[in-house]
């Protein structure tokens, strides 16, 4: 990669927002701490007409704020992408905090040195600002949902070169959600799978893997603190919203990472969550292997996930034609 600030590739941070004043300053401050030169990156918010201080906070960090009239946050990302000028695209959400000042610098350098990789995935690291439940979801599960965690293929570490790790999925499985929470793409790769026409972050990575880019990178010990949700009830509401969004997307496209040879099918993952035996076994395994008491959240989270998904199906069927339904279902998110 070229040396000198003026020769560094431009980076665009893309973020959809809606009434996130409780989280946004924490997120944007972590971007401001990056070692990457400020004149070589831009921050673009697609804001769905927030009524709190979201826009005011964004502008104090020099962010470009766009009016997002779309029906969900993925449409907001597509809008922001249309205005982005960066060679590299970083998808962040307001509930993310980048953990290390050199993360973006290392991510961009690693992608420049590894053209075979589709992008850079964040590690999700615990933080004093999150509850033990949040740390269980994001740090221990990484996928933030027991059902998706059970279905996802287990990535394999291919090689490590200093701080940079190369990962791939086993066999011909593509069942692993990639693309959000600090994920770094090349703009050219995103354009190659036509994200400007229809965008879903996990679909972009899936299309790239189908096109032959099976490998992705991680920067060892670096990524984001993901303040996904702090409470079990908040998790139930979060799963409700996410599943309603998923069902809406499935009306438009049948692309679905959960159908790409998952470890277990969806129906079996749901049964696992309500039969207690599997969750208890994984709880005990986690307690022994990791010596981490946060695994005690696994059984309640399994039940909460099923409840949230069932509630989502009912919501989708009874409120299907309601305008901006996904936005209305947004649960409150805070730091601890």
PLM regions and their residue ranges:
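Short aromatic/hydrophobic "clamp" motif used to bind/position activated sugar donors
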Residues: 89
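Non-catalytic, C-terminal membrane-associated alpha-helical segments of glycosyltransferases
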Residues: 240-244, 258-336
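Conserved donor NDP-sugar-binding/catalytic core segment of glycosyltransferases
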Residues: 97, 101-146
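Glycine-rich, basic loop-to-helix element that forms the pyrophosphate-binding segment
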Residues: 68-84, 106
């Amino acid at each position: 990669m070229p040396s000198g600030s003026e020769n560094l590739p431009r980076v665009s941070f893309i973020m959809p927002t809606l009434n996130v004043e409780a989280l946004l300053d924490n997120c944007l401050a972590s971007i401001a701490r990056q070692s990457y030169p400020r004149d070589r990156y831009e921050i673009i918010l697609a804001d769905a007409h927030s009524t709190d201080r979201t826009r005011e906070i964004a502008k104090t960090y020099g962010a470009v704020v766009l009016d997002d009239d779309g029906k969900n946050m993925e449409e907001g990302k597509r809008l922001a992408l249309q205005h982005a000028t960066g060679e590299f695209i970083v998808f962040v959400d307001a509930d993310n905090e980048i953990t290390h000042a050199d993360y973006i610098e290392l991510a961009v350098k690693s992608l420049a040195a590894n053209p075979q990789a589709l992008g850079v995935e964040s590690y999700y690291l615990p933080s004093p600002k999150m509850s033990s439940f949040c740390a269980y979801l994001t740090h221990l599960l990484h996928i933030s949902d027991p059902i998706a965690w059970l279905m996802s293929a287990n990535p394999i570490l291919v090689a490590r070169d200093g701080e940079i790790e190369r990962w791939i999925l086993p066999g011909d499985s593509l069942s692993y959600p990639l693309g959000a929470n600090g994920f770094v793409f090349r703009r050219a790769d995103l354009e190659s799978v036509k994200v400007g026409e229809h965008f879903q972050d996990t679909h972009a990575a899936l299309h790239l893997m189908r096109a032959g880019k099976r490998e992705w990178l991680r920067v060892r010990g670096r990524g984001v603190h993901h303040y996904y949700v702090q409470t079990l009830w908040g998790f139930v509401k979060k799963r409700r919203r996410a599943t309603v969004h998923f069902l809406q997307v499935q009306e438009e496209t049948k692309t679905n990472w959960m159908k790409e040879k998952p470890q277990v099918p969806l129906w079996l993952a749901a049964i696992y969550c309500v039969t207690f035996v599997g969750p208890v076994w994984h709880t005990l395994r986690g307690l022994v292997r990791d010596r981490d008491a946060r695994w005690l959240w696994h059984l309640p989270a399994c039940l909460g996930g099923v409840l949230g998904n069932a509630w989502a199906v009912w919501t989708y069927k009874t409120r299907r034609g309601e305008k901006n339904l996904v936005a209305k279902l947004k649960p409150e998110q805070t730091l601890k």
